Amino acid sequence: MGFPIPDPYVWDPSFRIFYSIIDDEHKTLFNGIFHLGHDDSADNLAELRRCTGKHFLNEQVLMQDSQYAGYAEHVRAHDGFIHQLDNWHGDVKWAKNWLVNHIKTIDFKYKGKI
C-alpha cells in the first residue's frame, strides 16, 4: 500500500522535508518525471538521471555529515532507483510511485536528524 500519486504530478507541501535544498531538488525530480511522462525521450531521461544523481549525492552527504543511522538503507533505495533509470523501460507510473513513496516513507525518517 502506498501513498496517493498526485494528479497532476507536481510537488506539493505534503512532501516538505524542511531542508530547502532537498525540497527544491525534490521539486526538480517531480518536474523531471512529469516531463518524462509527456515525452519519454532520451533527453528527458538523461536530464532526470542527471538531476537524480545530483540530488542523491547531496542528500547522502548530508546524511554522512550528520552520521544518520539510516544511511545504508537510504543508499540502497537510491541505488535501486538509479538502476531502474539506467535500464529504463518507459514505466513512468513506477517512477512516479517510487518518488512519492520514497519521500513520504524513507526521506521522512530523516526529518530533523540531518
UniProtKB/Swiss-Prot annotation:
Residues noted as binding Fe cation 1 in the record, renumbered to the chain: H26, H55, E59, D107
Tree of life domain: Eukaryota
Keyword Manganese: no
Alphabetical list of Gene3D superfamilies matching this protein: Hemerythrin-like
GO-annotated molecular function: iron ion binding; oxygen carrier activity
Alphabetical UniProt keywords: Iron, Metal-binding, Oxygen transport, Transport
Amino acids binding Fe cation 2: E59, H74, H78, H102, D107
SUPFAM superfamilies: Hemerythrin-like
Entry-linked Pfam families: Hemerythrin (PF01814)
Known role: Hemerythrin is a respiratory protein in blood cells of certain marine worms. The oxygen-binding site in each chain contains two iron atoms.
NCBIfam families xrefs: Hemerythrin (TIGR00058)
Annotated family: Belongs to the hemerythrin family.
Name of the protein described by the UniProt record: Hemerythrin subunit 2
